[in-house]
Amino acid sequence: VDPLVQKLSGHDLFRTYCASCHGPTGAGDGPVAPSMRRKPANLRQIAKRNGGVYPSELVYRVIDGRQPVRGHGGPDMPVWGDVFARSSQVRDEAVITARIEALVRHLEALQARTAN
């Protein structure tokens, strides 16, 4: 596995690849957001928009992007599976999977907590 993947946490990957659009906390308020046609999603509300359940498999597929998910993502969101494949020296699917899984876990940790 790519040593870079072993060193980068989901937080680091998010900061590198996602925060410019989605903001440092995932609220959809990154510095690039005002110039976009569609406002980036508030990633802290994924579970709330899904009846209180964090849909990790769906989030994985949306981030990967190589198999479009109807109604999710969009033309402004890069196909991260391809981006990670190009950035990996060995183009190892395990590296791509590890990066996306780290992002999925990080996004799960960002979910806004609601009072019961």
Name each model-derived stretch.
Residues 1-13, 51:
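Electrostatic cytochrome c docking/interface patches
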Residues 1-6, 19-20, 24-46:
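His/Cys-centered metal/cofactor-coordination and adjacent catalytic loops
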Residues 1-6, 104-116:
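Post-cleavage N-terminal segment of exported redox proteins
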Residues 8-19, 90-98, 112-115:
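Sequence context surrounding c-type heme c attachment/ligation sites in exported
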Residues 10, 14-24, 77, 103, ...:
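The canonical Cys-X-X-Cys-His
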Residues 26, 67, 111-112:
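Activation segment of ePK-like protein kinases, specifically the conserved APE
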Residues 30, 72-73, 116:
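Short, hydrophobic secondary-structure boundary micro-motifs
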Residues 36-98, 103-107:
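Extracytoplasmic electron-transfer domains, predominantly the class I c-type cytochrome c fold
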